[in-house]
Amino acid sequence: MNVEEIEKYLEENFDKLPEGCKQCVKGGKLVLFITGICNNNCYYCPLSEKRKNKDVIYANERLITTVEEAIEEAKLCSSKGVGITGGNPLLKINRTVKFLKALKKEFDEFHAHLYTTPETVNEENLKLLKEADLDEIRLHPTKIFNEGYDEEYIKFLCNKLNLCNKYIEDVGVEIPAIPNMENEILKLAEAIDGIAKFMNINELEFSEENYHELEKRGFMPKDDVSNAIAGSEETALKVIKEFKGDLFINYCPSVLKDAIQMRNRLINRAKNVAKPYEVITEDGLLLRGIMIFDNEDDLKEMAEILEENEIEFEIIDKNICLNPFILEDIIEEMKRQRFPITFSAYISELYPTADALEVERIPLITKKLKFRRRR
């Protein structure tokens, strides 16, 4: 599915989506990675080395340690809700409840959904989650995709889903679209129909961590520009087409996460964190102009010129940061006047995230070129 097809699908099915998905698509969810600890060892797990099996907390891309930092990140992103993930959040139930309660207290009508596995679902944990006002829970039946379909495990899963229904308003199942597992996924859908409200099927993707495990099982990228796996989308769409029950099945392709959900979340954050001189792109990235000086006197003189002309700028690490388009105008004017200040310059494109990851540098020529003719 391309972006246009996804947008059409969302337009036609938006009202049917779980509330967590509705907000996620709009970029309105804080992604709270509560721990990397997990009892499962799924071969398709996409977590990076810095997160997998590490007891760390991230609010979106930001490494945090406190509730206050999570609240701050939610405000910076204008978040309307939170998706609590891991690892397995229920292995750190007290921490999960602490953060959930704090976010619910800080924000009005703040929707919360949580991902976990049926093995860690029990009455005690569910009571704590209900008290913390969890709105939605999604169970990932890992055993089916690691060991194969098993009727006893499906009964176990259904019992856990029924238990969740006693405490949590919206209960669903979240799975990967493993190529050629249509029959197993269809049987799973039939088993949970009438128990779960929805089943979310994610397109399977390569990551640095799972690449070798997926490759040795014969999986291949579907094209040269995507991390998605060939056959994964076809499996998901075939399941949706062939399922005849009442359960709502939603397919979440990788391009939706990158081109729509992530983009919307970046735009939300960029609007709150962009400095006066930075430009927000249509993809939610930030553009800034950078002037680099070897001579401190040149830096001071340029700063004085900018101040005299009431141009917004900032000095960071002996570099001047300013509006990229104004920088281009300044360079052209200085070339025309043969201004004696010496510097190099470029336009920086970066994420509006806590790590301010730079994705591109566009060098700018700051001096007139001199051409010589051969004689």
From Swiss-Prot:
<feature type="binding site">
    <location>
        <position position="42"/>
    </location>
    <ligand>
        <name>[4Fe-4S] cluster</name>
    </ligand>
</feature>
<keyword id="KW-0560">Oxidoreductase</keyword>
<keyword id="KW-0479">Metal-binding</keyword>
<keyword id="KW-0004">4Fe-4S</keyword>
<dbReference type="Pfam" id="PF04055">
    <property type="entry name" value="Radical_SAM"/>
</dbReference>
<feature type="domain" description="Radical SAM core">
    <location>
        <begin position="23"/>
        <end position="246"/>
    </location>
</feature>
<dbReference type="InterPro" id="IPR013785">
    <property type="entry name" value="Aldolase_TIM"/>
</dbReference>
<dbReference type="InterPro" id="IPR040087">
    <property type="entry name" value="MJ0021-like"/>
</dbReference>
<feature type="binding site">
    <location>
        <begin position="44"/>
        <end position="46"/>
    </location>
    <ligand>
        <name>S-adenosyl-L-methionine</name>
    </ligand>
</feature>
<keyword id="KW-0408">Iron</keyword>
<feature type="binding site">
    <location>
        <position position="38"/>
    </location>
    <ligand>
        <name>[4Fe-4S] cluster</name>
    </ligand>
</feature>
<keyword id="KW-0949">S-adenosyl-L-methionine</keyword>
<dbReference type="GO" id="GO:0016491">
    <property type="term" value="F:oxidoreductase activity"/>
</dbReference>
<keyword id="KW-0411">Iron-sulfur</keyword>
<comment type="similarity">
    <text>Belongs to the organic radical-activating enzymes family.</text>
</comment>
<dbReference type="GO" id="GO:0051539">
    <property type="term" value="F:4 iron, 4 sulfur cluster binding"/>
</dbReference>
<dbReference type="GO" id="GO:0046872">
    <property type="term" value="F:metal ion binding"/>
</dbReference>
<dbReference type="InterPro" id="IPR007197">
    <property type="entry name" value="rSAM"/>
</dbReference>
<protein>
    <recommendedName>
        <fullName>Putative glycyl-radical enzyme activating enzyme MJ0021</fullName>
        <ecNumber>1.97.1.-</ecNumber>
    </recommendedName>
</protein>
<dbReference type="InterPro" id="IPR001989">
    <property type="entry name" value="Radical_activat_CS"/>
</dbReference>
<feature type="binding site">
    <location>
        <position position="45"/>
    </location>
    <ligand>
        <name>[4Fe-4S] cluster</name>
    </ligand>
</feature>
<dbReference type="Pfam" id="PF13353">
    <property type="entry name" value="Fer4_12"/>
</dbReference>
<feature type="binding site">
    <location>
        <position position="87"/>
    </location>
    <ligand>
        <name>S-adenosyl-L-methionine</name>
    </ligand>
</feature>
